[in-house]
């Protein structure tokens, strides 16, 4: 059976950065992996950030966003069925930062998916300097994503003080209490600078598994509490952007019958760096 891992992380926690490192370890081991970007947004920015992982041992897939929850679940199920035929050793699922984790477990229990996949690990990434003043809805999302995790990985721990890390863990446990979950985190917390991770650290994460846990559900309507905003190439001035655009339009290769074939090349050439 194909191992399947769920990597959750509250908004801005750094889970995409973690997945790049986690996936690279698997690739270096020789595993054949698939990464499924499972996002509600109409634009999947995280998939663009993972593009450099693509190769013989790693393929990226995504679920088209911009649909309701039921449609999203059907697309998730369909994509897993297709990926189950690709011969992967492991599939890594990266959901949005406001994901209902029950979707993952419910779909994995469906036939024929339950005969093809075995749940490996649920890992939750939490910012070591977690904002203390979160709304009830944000605390719920934080707790619901962490409740079933085999391991909580703190991001940016090298930038946090011991007091900030202590406060983050306390906040996480308070969020668990708010959703009437009996679980409290201590030994499951992984605190280490990601740049210093060794093979043994990744192997520990690969063996963390997951924890079946119950908590009180909160119904949150789509768009009720969070909206997606995209800020890209903010280091460019208006004049620099205009100059780059003019160069693209002046490029003769971008016109004519060969336009379709050269479009990708021209986009690379005019990329704002």
Predicted features by range, described:
Residues 24, 53-57, 79-81, 112, ...:
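Short, low-complexity, polar/charged sequence segments that are solvent-exposed and flexible
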Residues 33-34, 62-66, 88-89, 119-122, ...:
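Short, surface-exposed, polar/charged, turn-prone segments marking secondary-structure boundaries
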Residues 2-8, 13, 17-135:
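Nucleotide-state-sensitive switch-loop elements of NTP-binding domains
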Residues 1-2, 222:
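Extreme N-terminus of proteins, especially the signal/transit-peptide cleavage junction
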Residues 151, 159-273:
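C-terminal accessory "lid"/substrate-recognition subdomains
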Residues 27-28, 85-86, 146-147, 255-256, ...:
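Flexible, charged surface loops at secondary-structure boundaries
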């Amino acid at each position: 059976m194909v191992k399947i891992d769920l990597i959750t992380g509250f908004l801005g926690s750094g889970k995409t950065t973690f997945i790049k490192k986690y996936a690279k370890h698997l690739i270096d081991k020789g595993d054949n992996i698939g990464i499924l970007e499972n996002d509600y947004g109409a634009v999947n920015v995280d998939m663009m950030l993972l593009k450099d992982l693509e190769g013989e041992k790693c393929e990226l897939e995504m679920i088209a966003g911009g649909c309701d929850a039921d449609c999203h679940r059907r697309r998730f199920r369909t994509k897993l069925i297709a990926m189950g035929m690709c011969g992967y050793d492991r599939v890594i699922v990266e959901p949005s930062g406001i994901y209902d984790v029950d979707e993952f477990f419910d779909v994995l229990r469906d036939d024929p998916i339950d005969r093809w996949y075995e749940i490996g690990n649920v890992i939750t990434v939490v910012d070591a300097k977690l904002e203390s003043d979160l709304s009830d809805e944000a605390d719920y999302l934080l707790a619901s994503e962490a409740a079933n995790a085999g391991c909580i990985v703190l991001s940016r721990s090298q930038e946090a003080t011991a007091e900030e890390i202590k406060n983050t863990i306390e906040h996480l446990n308070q969020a668990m209490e708010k959703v009437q979950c009996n679980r409290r985190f201590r030994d499951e917390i992984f605190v280490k600078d990601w740049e210093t991770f060794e093979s043994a650290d990744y192997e520990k994460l690969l063996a963390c598994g997951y924890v079946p846990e119950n908590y009180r559900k909160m119904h949150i309507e789509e768009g009720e509490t969070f909206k997606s905003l995209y800020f890209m190439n903010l280091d460019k001035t208006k004049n620099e952007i205009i100059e780059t655009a003019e160069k693209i339009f002046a490029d003769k290769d971008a016109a004519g019958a060969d336009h379709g074939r050269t479009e990708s090349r021209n986009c690379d050439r005019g990329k704002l760096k």
